[in-house]
Amino acid sequence: MGTEKTQPLTLICHGESPKFYEIDFDLDGLRVHHFNPDIEWAMFVAWNRRVIPERFRSHYDEKFLPIARSSDVIAGKIANDRMVVVLDWFFNGFITDVGLLMSLQALGLGDQYCALTPEACSHAKVVSEKALSANECANLRAKSENQRSLAVKMVDRIRLEHRRDGIFFSEIIEQETGRAWT
């Protein structure tokens, strides 16, 4: 669930019989942890995607499990098909934290919400449902590819402009855990 309508549309357009659901998600009474668009958010994404090497996992388990266990909803910037390229570059040492954060800001992503508990799920109500035609899906796929291409060019420019600014993913892990990467 998210605030940016295009994000789920470009994902579902690859399915056989895609349907788009508009959802009303009432957060009142729920325990919501909202990640700011910062390095903690990126490290949470890395932890969830199991990108953090196993030898460092326990540190991040101690950091993020309490957040996940005490929340009905986790919210943060959408890690969509445009952002996944940037995240991969960050996780693989092609850009620093400065490049990542500048890219995150430049991409202008909406927020996404993950309902973690039955209570949170009960707060989500389907408002409308729309089946997508083959033509709509083709247009969405083309739009998605175009957006991804433009995003990669923009992020590559940011990467080059800030290649000496900040620290890399492995260095963040070293600093946070007090252990050497190698």
Predicted features and spans:
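Conserved NAD+-utilizing ADP-ribose enzyme module
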Residues: 14-19, 27-182
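Surface-exposed, glycine/proline- and aromatic-rich loop segments on solvent-exposed faces
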Residues: 22
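Extended catalytic/binding region for NAD+/ADP-ribose chemistry, centered on the ART fold
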Residues: 1-13
